[in-house]
Amino acid sequence: MAIVASLRDINLFSSLPSTPPMADSSSGTFRPAPPIPIPKYAPSNRNRNQKTNHQTDTNPKKPQSNPALKLPHHRTRYYKPVKEGVISSDGDRTILIGDSGVSYQLPGAPFEFQFSYSETPKVKPVGIREPAFMPFAPPTMPRPWTGKAPLKKSKKKIPLFDSFNPPPAGKSGVKYVEMPGPLPFGRYPKEGMNREEVLGEPLKRWEKGMLIKPHMHDNRQVNLGRDGFTHNMLELIHSHWKRRRVCKVRCKGVPTVDMNNVCRVLEEKTGGEIIHRVGGVVYLFRGRNYNYRTRPQYPLMLWKPAAPVYPKLIQEVPEGLTKEEAHEFRVKGKSLRPICKLSKNGVYVSLVKDVRDAFELSSLVKVDCPGLEPSDYKKIGAKLKELVPCVLLSFDDEQILMWRGREWKSRFVDNPLIPSLSETNTTNELDPSDKPSEEQTVANPSTTISSPKMISLWQRALESSKAVILEELDLGPDDLLKKVEELEGTSLAAEHTYTAMVLSNTDGAAEDYVDEKDRSEEYYSDIDDDFDDECSDDESLDPVGPVGSLPVDKIVRKLRERLK
């Protein structure tokens, strides 16, 4: 124990806590760490400015050299005036400015690509709102080195969709692929190299009805809105044609003002044929010999390009007017009643005709567009300016105010329509050229006021013998009643008369039939009827049963027995 006690710094009572060393007063008091960490707040603006000033003095920051951070975005006011021709090129990939606006030309493409093929103005743009670059994917993209070699391609060959050799109906995991057709009996599809070969023979009326009826109450369709027929809709229509022979396209809004242009663009770009059209609904047939595997494939647009800058539609001094006249027309247009009211996402098929008819009686016409986007009714005004034609005066208060222009000519040159004077009509005193001259009023004292629609209805009634022109105006009540009775008889005879013949056989039987050759073929508008009446003799349908087994044959036998 004496030896152990002689050792220094040895605690004989190890179980007891050792005495802690004396804390140095210079080092400060010891504080244990808190159970919850203290949050670190951002430095104040004063401290931040001091630090930044200190850094700029000692170690100045280098400017950011990343070009991606310098590109303009939708909040920047980018504007660059352009001229007609090539504005950007990358090898064979060029961006053009022409009559069709901004178009993109790719090597091997059948036509110049655009964002919208139907809603591009006919006026050349004067500037662009973003740098000229392609909205398509680049042809090649180098793979960055990731430390590993790229994966090998799969050896499994995935079969492509082939309309001529579709997968079997009972195969699991494969959707239905529509076969080509309809084809006459005994004929087979063949590969088509151009549009005429893919379409094949023209469809008959009963074939059109057979193709359209399943789509009448089906919502599987392509919706066409304010942008019109866009580039990516080409691939969308072909994806519809993969499953069905007819693609239903429903148009609403701005494109319906000029449906003829929409139908023309659809047939040109897709290669199909429009077999039926009702209002804003179009039925697009793919063709008898269509094959999804050999369809034309186009690159998709990855984003919507910014619309270019076009000249202003509303000029302060329109062509053919002075500044005072334009101001007077705009003031009088505020009290003018609109001819119609356009609803949002509506179908404006008859708008151009209504504006032309309104110009027959007034030099100013106003169309009300409540609730429409400003870009929508401005596009509608641009279309009316080109199709009617007319001069745009104002877009104030969501209304389109138009003037028919100096060079306007009436469609009714022989019998011009004379507007009636009324207190509510303020358009009669707008243009002195609109007032009828005294010679016209004296020469035609019996001219009545009527709209072009009523005149067309009267002409149709005269042609169908439902109306008659009275040559004598001074008729008594009895004579007028006789004329009315004669008209009723002729109209009923015209409606219920048809060519019928009665042929008597030796047995005394009689057969009645109607000759349908003289029946006028109207435009195909109603598909709820039967379409089997236009089958040709060489391609007639197969008989339903043996001869003499139909119920009609039994009725004929009974009639023959009675006649005997």
Swiss-Prot record:
Disrupted-gene phenotype: Plants are albinos.
Q: Where in the cell is it found?
A: Plastid, Chloroplast stroma
State the residue spans of region: Disordered.
14-73, 420-448, 526-549
Question: Which GO-annotated molecular functions does the record name?
Answer: mRNA binding
Return the Acidic residues bias intervals.
526-541
Q: Where is the CRM domain?
A: 201-297, 319-415
CC annotations in GO: chloroplast stroma; ribonucleoprotein complex
Q: Where is the composition biased (Polar residues)?
A: 44-67, 421-430, 439-448
Superkingdom classification of source: Eukaryota
Residue runs in coiled coils: none
Hydrolase as a keyword of this entry, yes or no, is no
Q: Which GO terms describe its biological process?
A: Group II intron splicing; mRNA processing
The transit peptide region is found at 1-43
Query: Where does this protein chiefly localize?
Result: plastid
Subunit comment: Interacts with CRS2 and RNA. Part of large ribonucleo-protein complexes that include group IIB introns, CRS2 and CAF2.
Q: What is this protein called?
A: CRS2-associated factor 2, chloroplastic
Q: Which species is listed as the source?
A: Arabidopsis thaliana
